[in-house]
Amino acid sequence: MILRFANLTAILALCLAAKPVDPPLPDPDAAAAEFGPAIGEPQLALYFTEPTLQAALGELQAGRPANALRRLPRKPVDSPVKWLRAMALRADEQPRPARALFEELALEGGPLADRALHLAALCAVDQGNGAAAERLFAQVSLRYVEADQVLLERARQTMQRLEAGPRTAARVEDILQPIFAGQVRADVAAAHLIAGDAQLAAGAREKARAHWRSGWVEHPLSAAADSAREREGQLGPGSSISSSLLLRRAEILLDAHRNRDALEQLSHIRVPSLCNGGCPGDRSASGYLKAALLALGALPQQHQPTPQEVEATPAEPADPLACRVRLDQGRALRKEREYGRARAALAQVVLRCSEAETRSRALFVLAQIETVSNKPTAGPLWEALARKYPESPLADDALYYEAIAARRASDPEKERALLDDLVDHHPDSDLRADALFRLFWAQWTDGRPRQGLRWLDQLAAGPESDGYEEERARYWRARVLLEPQAGETDAARASARETARTDLIWLVEGRPLTYYGLLAHGRLVELDPDRARAVELARDRLLQSPPPPALHAGTLARDPHLLAAIELLRLGLKNEAAKEISAIDRSPARSAGEAGYEPLTLVAELYSRAGDLRNAHAVVRIELRSLLRKPGSALARRAAALAYPLAFREQIEHVSETAAIPPDLLQAVLREESALDPRALSPTGALGLTQLMPATARMVARKLKLNGFSAGRLLDPEVNIRLGGTYLGELYARFQHPALALASYNAGPGAVSGWLKARGTLPLDAFVEEIPLDETRGYVKRCLRSFAAYQFLYSNGHTPALGQTLAAR
């Protein structure tokens, strides 16, 4: 019997060996070991699933903690319910039992232990128990996301608890030292404000002044800066503040686009005039500009400057600090579009200053102003910068924009020579790809597109981070090959069309969420409609496949802020979770290559669940650009949905119907204008989701008879979307094309009408490449890309059909 069973076992083994077997299912434990734990719906679900607990959470979030407490057990056993009850007790102004529960939670440990200690300490403060508060505050780790608030409150409580004097002031400074030393990310000015108060209470007026001065001079962007300045003013006159510190303050304000504040600060810095002994008799803006050109040897091309003229520097250079002050004034005035005053300031720097970095930057901004103003002086200024400072990091910019100026001056030979120089001698330039494309474009516009293919091939082969240049190169290579070639044989023509078809299919199938993928789809529909339909069917099937059920944390698995964020989300504390997510150290995932895609997508997913759509889409847009361009995988599609969320969709659909525009087009404008931030403010003063200028908004508000309108109402999403959508609808009705409506939204309808008058016979793709403003050209491409992405993701893989024909208006 045993023998017969053994024979049967052997036969079964042979049969099983002969039959193909399914691959083994992945071992979850092995996957977790390699990729980190999988975090999906079960790991992120709200703790409070019972109706009573859900109702308690709702009451607490609605500001009715007493109602929440009536629905909660008096002695909870589970930690989540303890958290809910402790928060309700504190909100109901019952600090003693709340503190007891928070201390109990802190003893349990876990990712929220520091938060429990912090809240327990605040309860002790509410009780008036300073000693207990100090004991609890002292236990909170500096890694805690709100460690700055712990230190600031601990310092305040120390001042209240101890008698004023030098020892107390020193103790306050010791507590705040991690903030002063940069160990904790914090509002440093707020810390100086408290330390100054402690020193003043101790009778040390000058020590107090030093703290308050540091607060407003070194940290002018802080909300505490004005208070610190006011406190110092109350002490009366003190020692003078060095001009270099005030200049640094002005530059911080300028970099933050607080241009008027920067100009006000610069006007109070005492420096000698740059005109002493060196400025020309004609002190007008045009006089300064003419003198600057002469000083640099930047004369018209027929006069080749001698080396002595090019190398000319001021015989008696002006004070370097005064030069920086005037440079910054010129920069601020340029940003405020006060071009006449900016020219006067910058030309003085070019004429009278010798420090290479200051002088070259002044020349750069001066040339920018002339370029924006479409002045013929732009080209000579760019030439002067490139010749005078060939080793400057601005030299490649100068070559590129001098080439653009040459093109505007109808000098294609000079344009090509300058672009060749940039490509050959500045291999690491961030403008090299644009130079290669402009070299191709020069051939295209001259009617010799095939001769430009070599530049496109270089562009497609060049290393880049996100694939944009390869997309641009392959689209235009297809366009070139689809153009008839004189004397071309039928075989050569068929070969060219097949190569073009291959490039178009590559874009349509592999890069549907891109601008050039959108254009390629329209071309493929014309060239091979059957293949285009097949691609759309494949997209439909792709989008119907389920997303990944969970995301692996990978190298971020042990980050304490990630773990804390997950717990807070499960407790329903979205705002607190968003702070923890922002504190996650993403560098391990960034440096992991493609292995970091999933953890970074998880970060974006957590932001989305916390209600922070702006940061959710920013993570994908900035950190996952390569993944986003190729939505063929389930992970990429999940990332794409986070990058293109349907934020404010109800308002958008309502306004779009009234304005007669596609809702996805308005959704795209919101995404590109404000990154979905209702409180967005641009350097030029545009406000809110659709980034309307107040003057434009007032005009639209009058048409809509919106009574009581003020610029502040643009921060209301509903008002902003209504006004921005209505304005976009007016432009859409006027120009009858999404691309033209977008261009006019950015640059103004007058500019677009002028471009149409000059180049309205061009097809859409060429017209966009010919938009003379870099900002507007990029804006149109980005908005159309977003328009295509929203259509692709939420319309079963379909993309908008953009007509290539434009009618001049």
Predicted regions and their residues:
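Bacterial N-terminal signal peptides
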Residues: 6-15
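Mg2+-dependent phosphoryl-transfer active-site scaffold
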Residues: 722
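Acidic, polar-rich low-complexity tracts and alpha-helical solenoid repeat scaffolds
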Residues: 2, 17-666, 670-672, 676-683, ...
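A glycine-rich, coil/turn loop motif that links secondary-structure elements
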Residues: 686, 713-715, 742
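Catalytic and substrate-binding regions of cell-wall glycan-acting enzymes that process beta-1,4-linked
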Residues: 491, 495-498, 507-508, 605, ...
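A short, structured beta-strand-centered segment in the mid-to-C-terminal lobe
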Residues: 709-719
